[in-house]
């Protein structure tokens, strides 16, 4: 089990696919995720499960996110984070994203590279 005092660092090799405006609603009303979304989710969940073997975190946490971007193209960071929280839940890293009490996000441009560094630690109230 992961100690509440321990900092956890995880890495994803691909940037999150932003959550909104990526779903297809045909006439039947059922929502489908495009392959780009489902492929990213499956890969991210697998990568997280390979790195995180403990029980899902069930206490208040602070999360530091470093988004490694391959270029200066505009990206929807808020929706990328929503996708990230979802896969962290599905992979069993966190019990629920409502346990995230503090978020610090940094964009880092590294030409030709991409990924996400996730650092999780217990939340300490100011």
UniProtKB/Swiss-Prot annotation:
| GO MF annotations, alphabetized | crossover junction DNA endonuclease activity; magnesium ion binding
Q: Which InterPro entries match?
A: Endonuclease_RusA, Endonuclease_RusA-like, RusA-like_sf
Q: Which reaction does it catalyse?
A: Endonucleolytic cleavage at a junction such as a reciprocal single-stranded crossover between two homologous DNA duplexes (Holliday junction)
**Protein EC:** 3.1.21.10
Q: Which SUPFAM superfamilies match?
A: Holliday junction resolvase RusA
Cofactor (UniProt): Mg(2+)
Specify which residues bind Mg(2+) according to the UniProt entry for this protein. Answer: 76, 78, 97
Q: Which GO terms describe its biological process?
A: DNA recombination; DNA repair
Which keywords belong to this entry?
DNA damage, DNA recombination, DNA repair, Endonuclease, Hydrolase, Magnesium, Metal-binding, Nuclease
Family the UniProt entry places it in: Belongs to the RusA family.
Q: What protein name does the entry list?
A: Crossover junction endodeoxyribonuclease RusA
